[in-house]
Amino acid sequence: ITTELVALDADFGDSVDSVITNLATLVHDTGRATDVAGLAQPAIDREAKAGTGVPGGVAIPHCRSEAVTEPTLAFARLGRGVDFSGPDGDAQLVFLIAAPAGGGKAHLKILSKLARALVRKDFLEALRSAPTKEEIVRLVLDVVNAEKPKKKPATESAAPAAGAAGTGSSAASNGSSSAAT
């Protein structure tokens, strides 16, 4: 996400299709997609199968597309909400995650990190009240690039135990290790 991929208090129309198309235009205009329709249509099609509205007045349409040249995150804070089939009404905060068709699963990691942050009321309020595009970019990058330091020590401390269990191969074949699983 860059400031060129952020729209604040935007009027992107009153339909899901128009919001997605306007966000796809931002992606195209930054050189990260070769064709607006080639990006917008897969996201619109995916949205038609299952709405991407989440609690808090947020939507996260996402897709893979041949038109996308690099994984991209675009954001719009809408002047008026649009119905993305969210559980609590219209969405005013919309993130478009666009990934190349042949790309890996990086966009799913972004989606996961973003979704975790969007349940925090302080994060939602910061997005709603941010005065500048630069502030939006900072807020989003802080979340998307955040590491989870609390989980790493647990994983590292579990690794030696797993390795120790693995050295007793006869115990593993007896099924005694299944109790630890």
Task: Give the label of every model feature segment.
Residues I1-T181:
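Cytosolic covalent-transfer regions centered on His/Cys nucleophiles
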